[in-house]
């Protein structure tokens, strides 16, 4: 993971221009996943890719690679408040030595959330790469668009933990020294929380690219201003860059959402008239940049 300019999001905008007018409820690029109507069922479709060069941290076991591949894909389903049903994967390896371990990781995560693994593909590659495709079913249509003035901004858990652990590894820390190793190696998609939140939230997305990126996406899609007025950094202590981690760190698979009230998350801000994302700390207000994790 690394902080970078928003080239990846520029590529997504290209996808929107080419495919964003398809005759579906929520087309490509508009949300974490696509919504399509099949009969009377509201179906959610999404895919994600992870590889050893840009996604797998040091000391990651093959079984954890499999877990991560399905977990990050299911996180997009969670951001729709949907129940995941089926999963397929395309696995590219330079050696079949750890193939079974990767499958076991996929199975562990799938079994935890009642997901059926129904197929996939195997290929050769110089770097281990796993692409996942998930199908889910939602009860209602919720996206990044819909936040309303006067609502609160909530998150299922405080962000920055995965990035903190990654930066500790990059400075020479051992895996057993990490305070939140599970956030980095076996992230848990917020499936149950997402289904509950979707019943009442006005907008929702996951924060895998960073809290800042996700809030900007909600702000732009909903045409509102978001102000963070309850920034908690104690969980990132004693990191000197705790605020940077909180706002711009990637790799957390929490859900951020807007609602009048909520018992499913931590309130971190409010929705106002206007545009952009801002933060209030010690009586001072500053603008939050559109910045976070990018593959490019």
From Swiss-Prot:
Residues annotated as binding Mg(2+) 4: 32, 46, 76
Keywords tagged on the record: ATP-binding, Kinase, Magnesium, Metal-binding, Nucleotide-binding, Thiamine biosynthesis, Transferase
CDD domains, alphabetized: ThiL
Pathway linked to the protein: Cofactor biosynthesis; thiamine diphosphate biosynthesis; thiamine diphosphate from thiamine phosphate: step 1/1
Source organism, top-level taxon: Archaea
Keyword hit for Nucleotide-binding: yes
Residues that, per the record, bind Mg(2+) 5: 209
Residues at which Mg(2+) 1 binds: 48, 121
Cross-referenced InterPro entries: PurM-like_C_sf, PurM-like_N, PurM-like_N_sf, ThiL-like
List of residues binding ATP: 120-121, 144, 208
SUPFAM superfamilies: PurM C-terminal domain-like (SSF56042), PurM N-terminal domain-like (SSF55326)
Residue positions binding substrate: 55, 293
Catalysed conversion reaction: thiamine phosphate + ATP = thiamine diphosphate + ADP
Positions annotated to bind Mg(2+) 2: 48, 76
Enzyme Commission number(s): 2.7.4.16
Gene Ontology process terms (BP): thiamine biosynthetic process; thiamine diphosphate biosynthetic process
PANTHER family (UniProt xref): THIAMINE-MONOPHOSPHATE KINASE (PTHR30270:SF3)
Function: Catalyzes the ATP-dependent phosphorylation of thiamine-monophosphate (TMP) to form thiamine-pyrophosphate (TPP), the active form of vitamin B1.
Extra remark beyond the main annotation: Reaction mechanism of ThiL seems to utilize a direct, inline transfer of the gamma-phosphate of ATP to TMP rather than a phosphorylated enzyme intermediate.
NCBIfam families documented for this protein: thiL
Name of the protein described by the UniProt record: Thiamine-monophosphate kinase
Native source organism of the sequence: Archaeoglobus fulgidus (strain ATCC 49558 / DSM 4304 / JCM 9628 / NBRC 100126 / VC-16)
Chain's gene name: thiL
């Amino acid at each position: 993971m690394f902080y970078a300019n928003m080239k990846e999001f520029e590529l997504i905008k290209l996808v929107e221009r080419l495919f964003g007018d398809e005759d579906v409820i929520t087309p490509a690029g508009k949300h974490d996943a696509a919504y399509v109507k099949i009969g009377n069922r509201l179906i959610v479709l999404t895919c994600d890719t992870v590889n050893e060069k840009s996604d797998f941290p040091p000391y990651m076991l093959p079984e954890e690679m499999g877990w991560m591949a399905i977990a990050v894909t299911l996180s997009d389903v969670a951001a729709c408040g949907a129940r995941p049903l089926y999963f397929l994967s395309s696995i590219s390896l330079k050696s079949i030595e750890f193939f079974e371990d990767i499958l076991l990781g996929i199975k562990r995560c799938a079994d935890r959330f009642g997901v059926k693994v129904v197929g996939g593909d195997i290929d050769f590659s110089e770097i281990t790469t796993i692409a996942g495709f998930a199908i889910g079913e939602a009860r209602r249509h919720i996206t990044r668009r819909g936040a309303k003035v006067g609502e609160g901004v909530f998150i299922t858990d405080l962000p920055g933990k995965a990035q903190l652990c990654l930066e500790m590894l990059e400075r020479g820390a051992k895996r057993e020294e990490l305070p939140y190793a599970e956030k980095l190696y076996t992230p848990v998609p917020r499936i149950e929380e997402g289904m509950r939140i979707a019943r009442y939230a006005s907008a929702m997305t996951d924060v895998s690219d960073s809290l800042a990126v996700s809030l900007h996406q909600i702000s732009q899609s909903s045409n509102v201003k978001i102000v963070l007025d309850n920034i908690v950094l104690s969980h990132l202590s004693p990191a000197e860059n705790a605020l940077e981690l909180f706002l711009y760190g990637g790799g957390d698979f929490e859900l951020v959402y807007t609602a009048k009230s909520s018992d499913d998350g931590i309130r971190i801000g409010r929705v106002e008239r206007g545009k952009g994302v801002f933060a209030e700390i010690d009586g001072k207000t500053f603008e939050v940049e559109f910045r976070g994790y990018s593959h490019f």
